[in-house]
Amino acid sequence: MIGAGIILLNSNNEVLLLLRDNKIEIPFPNMWDIPGGKVEDGESPEQAVRREMMEEMSIKNLGEINLFKILKTENLTDNIFWKRLNLNPKVIDLKEGQRIEYFNLERIRKTKLAFNYNQVLESFYSEIVIEY
């Protein structure tokens, strides 16, 4: 499977996370996650991120996004993008998930995230955020 997600970083260096729906039929129910999902046939990972942002949060124009990492495991190739973007979670028209919130690194470290995103975000903060 090929997946794509995006790390949305605000001007306070906090990451926007989505609390996944609490449905037993989905992986990692009721856990915090970065926005994203499965890359569909005929779609690039970047197109998938843009589609998922539209489907999950009604965000139509992300503008330029940056590739952070491509993570490969036995069953998954996960394309992780990032962008600086200040969004107000209270005005986002959330279509999937229970809610969205900004997390700083300290809170991320105290929260078990879906998939392997704790490690991904640790790496992101040390490689990207440190430059700002």
Please place each PLM-identified region on the residue numbering.
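Conserved N-terminal beta-strand and adjoining loop/helix that marks the start
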Residues: 1-16
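Short connector loops at helix/strand junctions that flank enzyme active sites
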Residues: 1, 29-34, 76-78
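Conserved Nudix-box catalytic region and its N-terminal flanking loop in Nudix hydrolases
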Residues: 14-51, 55
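A short coil-to-beta-strand element that immediately follows conserved catalytic motifs
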Residues: 60-69
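Active-site-adjacent beta-strand/loop module that shapes the phosphate/pyrophosphate-binding cleft
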Residues: 10-12, 69-91, 101-107, 123-124
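Nudix hydrolase/Nudix homology domain
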Residues: 25, 93-132
